[in-house]
Amino acid sequence: MPDLMPGNRFRKRVAASIVGKHGEFLRALGGNADLHRWLKANQPFPYFPQRFELYENIDATILHNEPIDYLEFGVFQGDSILKWASINSHRDSRFIGFDSFEGLPAAPDGITGYGPEGAFSTKGAVPATSDPRVRFITGWFNKTLRPFLRDFEPRSRLVIHNDSDLYSSTLYMLSTVDPILSAGSILIFDEFANPLHEWKAFRDYSYAFDHTYRMLGAAGYYYTQVALEMIK
């Protein structure tokens, strides 16, 4: 039925224009609201000013320095993976970092992105370490992760640390490692508060795979870093 009211047509055009120009901003606002509701529903949980304090608390109160299989996605200069290797000193722990070391694979949006293509590049240089428990796998996740998993057998509790920043990278990683996750596996997100990237990827993955979690703690401004333990 035709719209005989010019005022209605004008309002529709204005609304379409606003959504078209500011759709990403509106989606970010909606994502922030979803994140806020989720965090509120999962309280109480311990909060720490710095992420390394969160890591230390997890190892001391949950892992008790028992051996772990630690997989990190998005290594950059190695601060997190090397910190975890220093915190968890068990000789049987394994620490494996995945990164292209070429920076971000694509330029994300200007509202919730992190920089242009190539941001966080180390120009191919991997972090230096003398710890034999630590190794790095160089390349894009969609080229390296499946071949790695074909031969990988978890020996200890899994700790998955994600600092890949982008929605696509985070969702690909979570979906791909899902077969090796189980109750007790720990997931850590370094940029969880980003509503259109790590948070959205985690939410979509959890809905699709029907997983539930308990909060182990958070750190940083507005829960930038979050740690969870898988229940099912």
Write out the residue ranges for each language-model feature:
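Class I SAM-dependent methyltransferase Rossmann-like catalytic core
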Residues: 2-82, 86
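S-adenosylmethionine/decaboxylated-SAM
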Residues: 35-42, 60-232
